């Protein structure tokens, strides 16, 4: 997984599931999508924070729309929906180059100020 576009309130990653991400039945484990979506939703919130301010995911809701393919580069996009003093709410999606949706998530992050 690697970021390739970052703007205020948004981040794009490229991600590819390989053999390490397979479940016992041979398909890509849902935990792969969960990890990718947790990362992009959190990183989107992170783009809105001042230096020295942290965050932690307190809620992650994932909808699997279709099986994640193995060995295909996918795009993961995280976007902030709402920011307040204590919470950041964001959404994420995993799509392919044609825009086909594989998974969608919403996340709530607690803002941690020192």
Task: For every predicted segment, state its role.
Residues 1-2, 62, 92, 108:
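Hydrophobic/aromatic beta-strand elements that line small-molecule binding cavities or substrate pockets
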Residues 1-28:
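Catalytic strand-loop segment that frames the active site of acyl-thioester-processing enzymes
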Residues 12, 16, 27, 57-63, ...:
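Conserved beta-strand segments that form the floor/walls of ligand-binding pockets within enzyme
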Residues 31-51:
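Active-site helix/loop of acyl-thioester processing domains in fatty-acid/polyketide metabolism
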Residues 44-75:
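Hydrophobic beta-strand-centered segment that forms part of the acyl-chain substrate-binding groove
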Residues 68-114:
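HotDog/MaoC-like acyl-thioester-processing domains
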């Amino acid at each position: 997984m690697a970021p390739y576009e970052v703007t205020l309130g948004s981040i794009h990653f490229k991600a590819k599931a390989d053999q390490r991400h397979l479940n016992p039945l041979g398909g890509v484990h849902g935990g792969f999508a969960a990890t990718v979506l947790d990362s992009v939703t959190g990183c989107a919130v992170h783009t809105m924070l001042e230096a020295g301010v942290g965050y932690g995911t307190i809620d992650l809701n994932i909808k699997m729309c279709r099986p994640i393919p193995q060995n295909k580069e996918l795009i993961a996009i995280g976007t902030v929906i709402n920011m307040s003093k204590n919470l950041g709410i964001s959404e994420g999606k995993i799509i392919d180059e044609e825009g086909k949706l594989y998974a969608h998530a919403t996340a709530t992050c607690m803002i941690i100020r020192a």
